[in-house]
A protein has these predicted regions:
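Retroviral integrase
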Residues: 1-131, 174, 178-290
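Surface-exposed, charged/polar loop-rich segments
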Residues: 115, 122-170
């Protein structure tokens, strides 16, 4: 540890080599979207057909403006890859129903599920996400605070997108022959870019060059835990800083075994959280526990 903090030298980041795969963006997609609650915190979850990509966004509130902003970000993920969203299926009680005319101007039809019949596609995906979260939590050495739990949900969604469509048979469509994310972006999954870290891996982050501290005795690294790989060309990862609790993005780091000091610190963060997180987190969909 002392060697890392004292001897680490900053080096320029190298762009990850991108291997392209065939991308089929000729078809118009249908988007399924709804809100789930993880320990009371709202998350907008969407799934597309036939690509089956999952996208999750943590919401600060359930207002129509906040929900619509998140859904627009989901749609932008597809449009930047030249896909076209033809329709969005939401629950009849969703805040997005009030924005139907706004989406109609964009050429997107907003359909609603019948009363009492929620978006079944999203309900199945929520169960899948919860199973993966529960598996990770079962082997973590400490409890989670709410912010880290939400980050874990986003991490799980990103990992699911690295898989093929389960049960998909060979077909001329690219989304049946590569990962869900690869089918969307046309870029092949890379171990060094997409699988660099696991959730809550402990690392020492390399501090960027700062002229005010470059020739001082200030530590050259800071401790943090991994939250979410961003899967971009620089192989950057989002981390939680242990000394300040702030989130930041870095591409240079050294992975280390998690010491007891860090485990105790994360346990203290969870204990100090105003709202206690259950060991088996509560996932709710329309008032029902999933």
């Amino acid at each position: 540890m002392a060697s890392l903090k004292g001897k680490t030298v900053h080096t320029a980041s190298e762009a990850e080599k991108i291997i392209e795969v065939k991308q089929d963006n000729s078809q118009r997609l249908r988007l399924y979207a709804d809100i789930l609650f993880v320990e009371g915190s709202p998350i907008l979850l969407s799934c597309s057909d036939p690509v089956h990509l999952l996208i999750a966004t943590s919401l600060t509130s359930r207002t129509s403006s906040c929900t619509s902003k998140a859904l627009n970000a989901h749609i932008a993920v597809y449009t930047q890859e030249h896909y076209t969203i033809s329709s969005v299926l939401v629950d009849s009680e969703s805040e997005l129903v009030s924005m139907r005319e706004d989406y109609a101007r964009q050429g997107i039809r907003v359909d609603t599920a019948p009363p009492g019949q929620h978006v079944s596609v999203i309900e199945r995906k929520i169960r899948l996400v919860k199973e993966r979260c529960r598996a990770i939590i079962s082997v973590l050495p400490c409890p989670l605070c709410r912010a880290v739990l939400i980050a874990l949900v986003l991490f799980v969604v990103s990992r699911i997108n690295l898989l093929r469509v389960m049960g998909a048979k060979a077909s001329p469509h690219s989304w049946n022959r590569t990962s869900l994310r690869g089918a969307l972006t046309g870029r092949k999954m890379s171990y060094s870019r997409d699988l660099r870290v696991r959730s809550l891996d402990y690392v020492q982050l390399v501090e960027p060059v700062n002229m005010s501290t470059h020739k001082t005795l200030a530590p050259r690294t800071r401790g943090g835990v991994a939250l979410l790989p961003l899967s971009n060309s620089s192989a950057a990862v989002k981390f939680l800083l242990l000394d300040t609790g702030a989130a930041l993005i870095r591409s240079k780091f050294t992975m280390l075994p998690m010491p007891d000091l860090v485990i105790n610190h994360l346990t203290a963060l969870a204990a100090a959280d105003k709202k206690t997180v259950n060991k088996d987190p509560l996932f709710q969909y329309h008032g029902r526990s999933i």
